[in-house]
Design a protein with these regions (language model features):
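Ras-like small GTPase catalytic G-domain
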Residues: 3, 8-29, 33, 38-46, ...
């Protein structure tokens, strides 16, 4: 019997502090310019950037948060909204705990895309994903609502 199956190695591994209790993979999808990257950066860094930078392919970030005394490591995948990257985007649905469907409330077409394209893509390529969350973004642009009231 090798040492890896008993005693010494197992003890070394278990003595290391756990990095997290729960791991969540979240994927952001939606048309270009709806604010997916801004949502991710706001959650991860707590900052907002007025300048738009296209996501090329995908970007991902991690953040560890505490929820009810449990350390949760959140991995957020920010996918490109441009059509030329949509086939790449669908490969990231696998293993996702949630997919956030993001639209711009000032752009009706971005909302229509959710039902006309994104839902079908998720059903076709990510059928095991149970948690679909619809996010209407850019409320501050639509009504001039101060950030403090959001």
């Amino acid at each position: 019997m090798s040492n890896s199956m008993n005693g010494s190695n197992a003890k070394k591994r278990s003595s290391r502090p756990k990095e997290y209790d729960v791991f969540l993979k979240i994927v952001l999808v939606g048309r270009s310019y709806v604010g997916k990257s801004s949502l991710m950066i706001r959650f991860i860094d707590g900052t907002f950037n007025d300048f738009y930078v296209n996501t090329i392919g995908v970007d991902f970030r991690f953040k560890t948060i505490m929820v009810k005394d449990r350390k949760v490591k959140v991995q957020i995948w920010d996918t490109a909204g441009q059509e030329k990257f949509r086939t790449i985007t669908s490969t990231y649905y696998k293993g996702a705990d949630a997919i956030l469907l993001v639209y711009d409330i000032t752009n009706r077409e971005s909302f229509d895309d959710i039902n006309n394209y994104w839902i079908h893509e998720i059903e076709k390529n990510g059928s095991e994903v149970q948690n679909l969350i619809l996010i209407g973004n850019k409320a501050d642009y639509a009504a001039g609502i101060p950030e403090a009231r959001l």
